[in-house]
Amino acid sequence: MVKKIGVLTSGGDAPGMNAAVRGVVRTALTQGLEVFGIHDGYLGLVEDRIEKLERHSVSDMINRGGTFLGSARFPEFKEVAVREKAIANLKKHDIDALIVIGGDGSYMGAKKLTEMGYPCIGLPGTIDNDIAGTDYTIGYLTALNTVIDAIDRLRDTSSSHQRISIVEVMGRHCGDLTLMAAIAGGCEYVITPETGLNKEALIQNIQDGIAKGKKHAIIAITELMTDVNALAKEIEAETGRETRATVLGHIQRGGQPGAFDRILASRMGNYGVKLLVEGHGGRCVGIQNEQLVHHDIIDAIENMRRPEKLELYKVAEELF
């Protein structure tokens, strides 16, 4: 029977992580459990930076961006000896189970602990929206609005100067953030890991647009696909139209979470605790068709695939 639980945030921060921690803490206390916060993710777990949390510990946190528990990249957690030390620290505090809030790397850590017999629940916290088994991740829609706001501002200046603007969006190997921002921001071109980058076709499309009287254009592209500044120089050289690249970077992770992410994070935090109370471990939480669901975390990482957004790419193509 679970009496004490731990909670940590790991990997890249995402708006709504604090709301998720709050959901975990408040629900755990309501259920008569003790709850412990672990600072700086798996690194803090190994270094035993663990403190007991009370209701007041999460007061005024629901509207705050980032994560008050802190986060850190910690690749050494892949090592068995390191994970054994983490479990020893959890047992030292008599913590029976752990809730991990983060992205795919964080899930992998939870999976490894699960395989070692320690019960974990994963909550999807990442702006990339790249986690299988859920329609939305915590922080994604807030980041989407941040990107759209930036695109709107770029359009103002691009149209004033008859300029082509390239905007680089986060997402790593997932194009969801770029695709949705491109549709909502009215971008002329969208380039994601799912579409690939065809420079010749892109330049030809831009030239065709100029020939038809197009005065400016915005290209949305997912990070890590190419050097966007070099791409801007190529486009300018081929089209004769001034072209500039803007890398949005970490601004996409910051800011107050929107209403959707606050509610989603609160629901997921609440649900994660209840799963542990009911005796479930080794699960990850998602939302599908507006309903909270849970999956085997090992199966989610190894076998589940995110559905392709073919219809939305078709919409984007027809609107551009």
Swiss-Prot record:
Pathway recorded for this protein: Carbohydrate degradation; glycolysis; D-glyceraldehyde 3-phosphate and glycerone phosphate from D-glucose: step 3/4
GO cellular component terms attached to this protein's record: 6-phosphofructokinase complex
Protein name: ATP-dependent 6-phosphofructokinase
Catalytic activity, reaction form: beta-D-fructose 6-phosphate + ATP = beta-D-fructose 1,6-bisphosphate + ADP + H(+)
UniProtKB keywords: Allosteric enzyme, ATP-binding, Cytoplasm, Glycolysis, Kinase, Magnesium, Metal-binding, Nucleotide-binding, Transferase
InterPro entries noted in UniProt: ATP_PFK (IPR022953), ATP_PFK_prok-type (IPR012003), PFKA_ATP_prok (IPR012828), Phosphofructokinase_CS (IPR015912), Phosphofructokinase_dom (IPR000023), PKF_sf (IPR035966)
Regulation: Allosterically activated by ADP and other diphosphonucleosides, and allosterically inhibited by phosphoenolpyruvate.
Binding sites annotated in the UniProt record for Mg(2+): D104
Origin species: Aliivibrio salmonicida (strain LFI1238)
UniProt gene name: pfkA
Locations listed in the record: Cytoplasm
GO biological process: canonical glycolysis; fructose 1,6-bisphosphate metabolic process; fructose 6-phosphate metabolic process
